[in-house]
A protein has these predicted regions:
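Extracellular/periplasmic juxtamembrane segments that couple receptor/chemosensory ectodomains to their
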Residues: 218, 228-289
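Conserved nucleotide-binding and Mg2+-coordinating catalytic segments in signaling enzymes
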Residues: 310-329
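Juxtamembrane extracytoplasmic/periplasmic/luminal helical "stalk" adjacent to the first N-terminal
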Residues: 40-101
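N-terminal signal-anchor/signal peptide hydrophobic helix marking the start
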Residues: 30-43
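Extracytoplasmic/periplasmic ligand-binding sensor regions of membrane-associated signaling proteins
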Residues: 135-195
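Active-site-proximal structural segments of metal-dependent nucleotidyl cyclase/transferase enzymes
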Residues: 328-345
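Cytoplasm-proximal transmembrane signaling helix
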Residues: 273-312
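Extracytoplasmic/periplasmic sensory segments of membrane signal-transduction proteins
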Residues: 70, 81-146
């Protein structure tokens, strides 16, 4: 009787321990089903952040490299386009030198030098504009450059420093803008002494003079700005022409014409960040991360259900006590653990 009683209490202790362990197991399983998918998702977010950061850095570097190449290439083209306009003044200068300060048939020569980007060609002996082509509508341009309030200082600088100067932009009568290029001319008298003859002048239309370059850049998706120093002695830049959009953190190219510095700046219209690519990457990897989290939870739930079915196969559904199959399995495990012990069932 005592042996049976001891066995009964031992069995009850075992079942109580089992029930407590089972309840604790269920709590742990609930935590596991929540935490593991959450950790999987958070790790996915960390991985996405790293991928996005690396991609963003690489894209910005590539866009900067491409922009640097474009700004240097088209900056040089703009310089050449402006220089081509300035060459008209050099042509007139050479004629004046060869003809000892005289130009015969000025209108014919100037007409042959004209192009769509040239507003007018002028001669200014002793700094006073006397000849303009085309003459019609440009009568007001016949002024004394040396003593003019707005043009005198920079014209004297060109004369005294033997350098080409550009002034502007200023508004033209047609509503467009122009830049005046003044090229000082020096001749020699009978004694071989050099003296100032005057200026050969060309008025360049803005933006016509560099329309090919800015049109190409606009098609490539860039905002742009062209600036020049306000005067040869100044460090202040004045905008010559710019696109309608905003210029943010531009790359730039500088060049010199005469004694004046020019600056050409560009920036992508869509910005330095490739937002479309980043959205695609975030969307794709976020979807993968969510799917992995869901699949992890599904796997954990399936695993838990499998364990529950295994428990149901071994225990009574009402009492949660081992049934015959479960008891036999449990007894077999106990015997295997303690092969030298004696058990009564």
């Amino acid at each position: 009787f005592f042996i049976k009683l001891i066995l009964f209490f031992n069995f009850c202790d075992i079942m109580l321990y089992y029930n407590n362990s089972h309840e604790q197991n269920e709590v742990n399983q609930v935590k596991k089903k929540t935490l593991v998918p959450l950790i999987t998702f958070l790790l996915g977010i960390c991985l996405i952040s790293l991928i996005v950061y690396k991609t963003d850095t690489h894209e910005k570097e590539q866009r900067h490299i491409t922009a640097q190449l474009n700004v240097a290439n088209y900056g040089e083209r703009i310089k050449n386009e402006i220089t081509n306009g300035i060459e008209i003044t050099d042509t007139l200068k050479q004629i004046l030198i060869s003809e000892d300060g005289e130009i015969h048939q000025f209108e014919t020569i100037a007409g042959n030098l004209m192009s769509d980007s040239i507003e007018s060609v002028q001669l200014a002996p002793n700094g006073v504009v006397t000849d303009i082509y085309p003459a019609n509508g440009n009568e007001a341009g016949k002024i004394d450059l040396i003593h003019d309030k707005d043009r005198g200082k920079i014209s004297c600088y060109a004369r005294d420093n033997h350098t080409i100067i550009t002034q502007g932009p200023f508004k033209l009568k047609q509503g467009e803008y122009g830049i005046a290029v003044r090229n000082p001319v020096y001749l020699k008298d009978k004694n071989g002494h050099e003296y100032f003859w005057g200026f050969t002048i060309v008025i360049l239309r803005v933006p016509d003079i560099f329309s090919d370059s800015i049109s190409a850049l606009s098609n490539f998706g860039y905002e742009y700005k062209i600036s020049k120093t306000d005067a040869p002695w100044s460090d202040t830049y004045k905008v010559v022409y710019q696109s309608d959009g905003q210029i943010n953190h531009p790359v730039s190219y500088t060049f010199t014409i005469g004694d004046e510095n020019w600056e050409f700046e560009i920036t992508p219209k869509s910005g330095w960040r490739n937002a479309t690519l980043l959205i695609i990457i975030i969307g794709m990897f976020l979807t993968i991360s969510l799917l992995l989290s869901v699949l992890t939870r599904v796997w954990l739930v399936a695993k838990e259900h499998k364990k529950k079915f295994q428990i149901l196969a071994r225990t009574d559904s009402l009492t949660n006590i081992y049934n015959r199959y479960g008891f036999d399995e449990f007894a077999e495990k106990m015997i295997q653990k303690n092969p030298k012990a004696h058990f009564v069932a």
